[in-house]
UniProtKB/Swiss-Prot annotation:
Enzyme type, top EC level: oxidoreductase
GO MF term set: pyrroline-5-carboxylate reductase activity
InterPro entries: 6-PGluconate_DH-like_C_sf (IPR008927), NAD(P)-bd_dom_sf (IPR036291), P5C_Rdtase_cat_N (IPR028939), P5CR_dimer (IPR029036), Pyrroline-COOH_reductase (IPR000304)
Compositionally skewed regions (Low complexity) per UniProt: 282-298, 306-342, 383-415, 424-441, 448-475, 487-496, 503-520
Gene label: pycr1
Subunit composition and interactions: Homodecamer; composed of 5 homodimers.
Domain of life the protein comes from: Eukaryota
GO biological process, one term: L-proline biosynthetic process
Pathway terms, separated by semicolons: Amino-acid biosynthesis; L-proline biosynthesis; L-proline from L-glutamate 5-semialdehyde: step 1/1
Similarity annotation: Belongs to the pyrroline-5-carboxylate reductase family.
The protein, known as: Pyrroline-5-carboxylate reductase 1
Length: 551
């Protein structure tokens, strides 16, 4: 960046900073490209950029590019601004401060450098090169010497006078008078404008238009100021020239004085001066009070700590040593805890990767396990179907043979009944034929026993009263050797129930749903055949009982 030897940086381009920048260009002592303006919000000073001014938000860049720095911020923003330019300020810079209430020593101590600082108090008329600027370089009790620092201060004062004389008029005062000058010089613009406005309102009341009244009042005030500045007379001298005996001027002045015109102006200026003195110092006082409170609090804590140590030392020595060891262990633990806390992020990152890997392995194992289970279930269903198909074929063959056996048993029963009526003893049949034609129920076995009994016992049985039908229908107990076919039917029925339970439990697998449905329909058909065969058996049994009752 190019450092302009005669360049000016205006930090804080508000109303006053904007007026100073335009006044510098209007004085023809500076060009617009030699002035750098800074502000937080650049939208308000964007038109100045089109006029050739350098605009930025960085105070550091502005100070590094210019030798003369004019600080134009409000007192509340001064500390932050000084912090931002502390590193870029050198002893070759000239700092001109227009901040109300901030002394030279406050600014120098904050910058921590022996930089020449000039306090200035202009007004907004500087825009038209009509400002009255008050300057100060040192306090009243300080005197100029031939030291390098004093020479640098005097040189800085001459540069400031040269700048502000081009913008109006300047006067050198002591630093103690800068605060009252703020009320009279800077605030005076507002006071005199209010007086001009009051005069314009009076002109409207007596018949003038507002614009005409303001123009007449403002030009009259300018003429009055010119008379005082050019002639260097007292204001009362000019007043006496205007007033005449029993005239209108003296009548109006007297009415203003009765209303308190002069006293109101005086009171307003004094009040403004008092307030200007406390703008920055009040903030500093608040900071000092806070610092004092902190110091007092620290001292109080230090005293309490010392008292506690004295009490501990007065105790037994071993207790004191134990407390020291505990404090040392606690400090070591805290250091280790802090180190672990710093590395906690890395450990957590590794744990997350390990968890992701474990979850992936679990998912893969579950998929393998499910596929193996499905394969086993499918194989088990095939085995069940094959086992179930074999007994159904055997039962179908038995059912075809069963009607022939029933016909033979009916014929034998009819023959026995006819012989019993005629009084003939039944003929004994050979054992081979009985073994071939085995009855399917226990009632046929009882008939064979009756045939083997002698005729006397048969007559006694006929003489006995007939038992109820329910008792007659109960099957007689036979030995296990005489009914081998019943032993074969019981395991088949148990196998069917086991297969049915296994089918119902295995039906939950979703992959073999269609196969299981076929198996289920076949199983119900088989159950239907068993039901029909059992019903045929009971019908034959009832028929035999009826024939016995008739006999």
């Amino acid at each position: 960046m190019k450092l302009y030897d005669n360049g000016v940086a205006v930090l804080g381009c508000g109303n006053l900073g904007n007026a100073i920048a335009k006044g510098l260009v209007a004085s023809k002592q500076f060009k617009s490209n030699q002035i750098v303006l800074t502000k937080r919000n650049l939208s308000t000073i964007e038109p100045l950029k089109r006029e050739g001014y350098h605009v930025t938000t960085s105070n550091h860049d502005a100070v590094s590019r210019c030798k003369i720095v004019i600080v134009c911020v409000v007192p509340a923003q001064l500390d932050d601004l000084l912090d931002s330019i502390k590193q870029s300020v050198t002893e070759n810079h000239i700092i001109i401060s227009v901040v109300s209430g901030a002394s030279i020593e406050d600014i120098r101590s904050h910058l921590e450098k022996d930089v020449p600082i000039v306090r200035a108090m202009p007004n907004t008329a500087i825009q038209h090169c009509q400002s009255m600027t008050c300057l100060a370089i040192r306090s009243s009790h300080q005197k100029s010497t031939n030291s390098p620092s004093d020479k640098a201060k005097d040189n800085a004062l001459e540069v400031a006078k040269k700048i502000f004389n081009c913008l109006g008029m300047s006067i050198v005062l002591s630093e103690e008078q800068i605060v009252p000058a703020t009320a009279l010089c800077a605030c005076g613009i507002a006071f005199f404008c209010r007086a001009i406005r009051a005069a314009a309102q009076g002109g409207c009341e007596i018949g003038f238009h507002a614009e005409d009244a303001i123009r007449i009042a403002a030009q009259t005030a300018k003429g009055a100021a010119t008379l005082l500045l050019e002639n260097n007379f007292h204001p009362e001298y000019e007043i006496d020239k205007v007033t005449t005996p029993q005239g209108c001027t003296i009548a109006g002045l007297n009415q203003m004085e009765h209303a308190g015109f002069s006293s109101a102006m005086i009171k307003g200026i004094v009040t403004s001066s008092d307030k200007a003195a406390s703008l920055y110092t009040q903030k500093q006082q608040n900071k000092k009070q806070q610092q004092l409170k902190q110091q007092q609090h620290q001292q109080h804590q230090h005293q309490q700590h010392q008292q506690h140590q004295q009490q501990v030392q007065q105790q037994e020595p071993h207790q004191y040593q134990q407390q020291q060891q505990q404090s040392h262990q606690q400090s070591q633990y805290n250091q280790g805890h802090n180190y672990g806390h710093q590395n906690q992020h890395h450990h957590n990152h590794d744990d997350q990767h390990q968890n992701y890997y474990n979850q992936d392995q679990k998912r893969r194992n579950n998929r393998k396990h499910r596929s193996n289970e499905n394969y086993d279930n499918h194989h088990h269903h095939n085995q069940q179907y094959q086992q179930h198909q074999q007994p159904t074929q055997q039962e179908s063959q038995e059912q075809t043979q069963q009607p022939e056996q029933t016909q033979s048993t009916n014929q034998s029963n009819q023959r026995r009944n006819s012989e019993s009526r005629n009084g003939k003893s039944p003929q004994k049949q050979p054992q081979k034929q009985s073994q071939v034609q085995q009855p399917s129920s226990t009632t046929e076995n009882t008939d064979q026993q009756q045939q083997q009994q002698p005729p006397q016992e048969q007559q006694q049985q006929q003489e006995q009263p007939q038992q109820p039908q329910e008792q007659q229908q109960q099957p007689n107990v036979v030995d296990e050797a005489e009914r081998p076919k019943e032993q074969q039917q019981q395991p088949q029925q148990q196998q069917q129930t086991i297969d049915k339970k296994g089918y119902n439990n295995n039906r939950r697998g979703g992959r073999h749903y269609s196969y299981n449905n076929n198996y289920n329909s076949h199983h119900h058909r088989h159950n239907g055949i068993n039901k029909n065969s059992s019903s045929m058996y009971h019908d034959e049994k009832r028929h035999e009982v009826k024939t016995e009752q008739i006999n």
